[in-house]
Curated annotation (Swiss-Prot):
Residues 119-234, 280-325 are annotated as: Disordered. The modification Phosphothreonine is found at residues 186, 191. This is E3 ubiquitin-protein ligase RING1. InterPro entries: RAWUL, RING1/RING2, Znf_RING, Znf_RING/FYVE/PHD, Znf_RING_CS. The keyword Iron does not apply. It comes from Pan troglodytes (Chimpanzee). Its EC number is 2.3.2.27. It is found in: Nucleus speckle. The lineage of its organism: Eukaryota, Metazoa, Chordata, Craniata, Vertebrata. A zinc finger (RING-type) spans 19-59.
Length: 377
């Protein structure tokens, strides 16, 4: 020994003193007799007992423990390099704990950031969703089986005094040549001046007052749309084929509303619409009423209708306009025919979404029938 010192890097030193099985510093070193690979005593004995009768490093055959021998010289070398084995192991445990804690904190922070990012993305998608003019709007057009040609289908029954509150243009709907128009005699009397028959609708001259309606108040312009718990329901509203006579006021209506609207809402809406349309029909016949003169397009006596006359004082008295205050959802009953031609009366508290799921169950607009209630209470 001449006292020569050789510098060895900690990395290479650690690889020489490490057990290939537990990847820790060798303890009670055992060396194979044939290939001279070193392992911890407990590690190699456990490997042999598990049935793996070969060297874990080079796969050379190891019959039993007799193929191993202890290596006290290597243990002495390790004790020279690391005099305090317990201190080294304690330091190693502290490093592992610190690394584990740091890794857990990083994983937690990354998880929180990912959650915040996903929430922000979903929130932005909800904000960017297109806002219609009013989510509670019911789109309706008149006709005897086809949508009528109403030029302004967006009247709000519940707020007639604020027509400017409806924002934006209405969505386009299919137009058909149904019997939705009405002809008004310009020189007619009180009853003979209206020539549209049952189901007529003066939607063009009234600017959309008969074309549509809502089941609730409209949303102001720019306001966020209210939540839609039940989505939207499209339905076809027809008169009852057995309970509604042809001479009565009846027409097919096409309605689009929210799924949380009830059958009572539809009944009240229908009563309001029919009362309003009858009132406007009577208003359209006022030019030929009492006191009205002859017209070029009227009858030979200038009356233009059954109740009109050349002199205003001799004609029948003008009937009073129907009031909208007494309108009730009890005036009309709603029916549904799930199949087989049998009509079922719907309870007023049922929502349209529940009716669609319980009675309809087909992929086309919900079809309902209406008829005047015989004994409204």
């Amino acid at each position: 020994m001449d006292g020569t010192e050789i510098a060895v890097s900690p990395r290479s030193l650690h690889s020489e003193l490490m057990c290939p099985i537990c990847l820790d510093m060798l303890k009670n070193t055992m060396t194979t007799k044939e290939c001279l690979h070193r392992f911890c005593s407990d590690c190699i004995v456990t490997a042999l007992r598990s049935g793996n009768k070969e060297c874990p490093t080079c796969r050379k055959k190891l019959v039993s423990k007799r193929s191993l021998r202890p290596d006290p010289n290597f243990d002495a070398l390790i004790s020279k390099i690391y005099p305090s084995r317990e201190e080294y192991e304690a330091h190693q445990d502290r490093v592992l704990i610190r690394l584990s804690r740091l890794h857990n904190q990083q994983a937690l922070s990354s998880s929180i950031e990912e959650g915040l990012r996903m929430q922000a993305m979903h929130r932005a998608q909800r904000v960017r969703r297109p806002i219609p003019g009013s989510d509670q709007t019911t789109t309706m057009s008149g006709g005897e089986g086809e949508p009528g040609e109403g030029e302004g289908d967006g009247e709000d029954v519940s707020s007639d005094s604020a027509p400017d509150s409806a924002p934006g243009p209405a969505p386009k709907r299919p137009r058909g040549g149904g019997a939705g128009g009405s002809s008004v005699g310009t020189g007619g009397g009180g009853t003979g001046g209206v020539g549209g028959g049952a189901g007529s609708e003066d939607s063009g001259d009234r600017g959309g007052t008969l074309g549509g309606g809502t089941l609730g108040p409209p949303s102001p312009p720019g306001a966020p749309s209210p939540p839609e718990p039940g989505g939207e329901i499209e339905l076809v509203f027809r008169p009852h084929p057995l309970l509604v006579e042809k001479g009565e006021y009846c027409q097919t209506r096409y309605v689009k509303t929210t799924g949380n609207a009830t059958v009572d809402h539809l009944s009240k809406y229908l009563a309001l619409r029919i009362a309003l349309e009858r009132r406007q029909q009577q208003e359209a016949g006022e030019p030929g009423g009492p006191g009205g003169g002859a017209s070029d397009t009227g009858g030979p006596d200038g009356g233009g209708g059954e109740g009109g006359g050349a002199g205003g004082g001799d004609g029948p008295e003008e009937p009073a306009l129907p009031s909208l205050e007494g309108v009730s959802e009890k005036q009309y009953t709603i029916y549904i025919a799930p199949g087989g031609g049998a009509f079922t009366t719907l309870n007023g508290s049922l929502t349209l979404e529940l009716v669609n799921e319980k009675f309809w169950k087909v992929s086309r607009p919900l079809e309902l029938c209406y008829a005047p209630t015989k004994d409204p209470k």
